[in-house]
Amino acid sequence: MPRHHQRGSTASGGSQRQLRVAETVRHAVADILSQGSAHDPDLEGHIITVPEVRMSPDLKLATIYIMPLGGRDTEIVLAALERNKKFLRGEIAHRVNLKFAPDIRFRADERFDEAERIEKLLRTPAVQRDLNSDSEES
């Protein structure tokens, strides 16, 4: 059976160039948001982290994952970022040396919620009992 791998792809799902550009875009967006350059009241009231950016293989689309500090008001922040998308794309174009400024889309980073859900599950009495009985049998 033939394997279909993207040329130069890595275990994390993108080429070295995709990963490098994604990290550059991530730094640019984090700088823009931390400086308050967008001048939007919904953004100015929040500290926003940018844990990940994923680039499409042609580098024309950047999916930017964001997380407001504390995980509150995610929908408000996403709406504000959508309103300021044109400005943010222009700022990214000035800061990142690419032939074309990538189109951008924003998504909430839900990995923290998932990790918290797993932590709560691991702390339940039933799971603790199973974990303790497994360690006693060893």
Swiss-Prot record:
Residues that span the membrane, as ranges: none
Pfam families registered for this protein in UniProt: RBFA (PF02033)
SUPFAM superfamilies found in the cross-reference section: Ribosome-binding factor A, RbfA
A GO MF label: ribosomal small subunit binding
GO biological process assignments: maturation of SSU-rRNA
Subcellular location: Cytoplasm
Cellular component, GO annotation: cytosol
Description of how the protein assembles with itself and partners: Monomer. Binds 30S ribosomal subunits, but not 50S ribosomal subunits or 70S ribosomes.
Family: Belongs to the RbfA family.
Reported function: One of several proteins that assist in the late maturation steps of the functional core of the 30S ribosomal subunit. Associates with free 30S ribosomal subunits (but not with 30S subunits that are part of 70S ribosomes or polysomes). Required for efficient processing of 16S rRNA. May interact with the 5'-terminal helix region of 16S rRNA.
Name of the protein described by the UniProt record: Ribosome-binding factor A
Gene name for this UniProt entry: rbfA
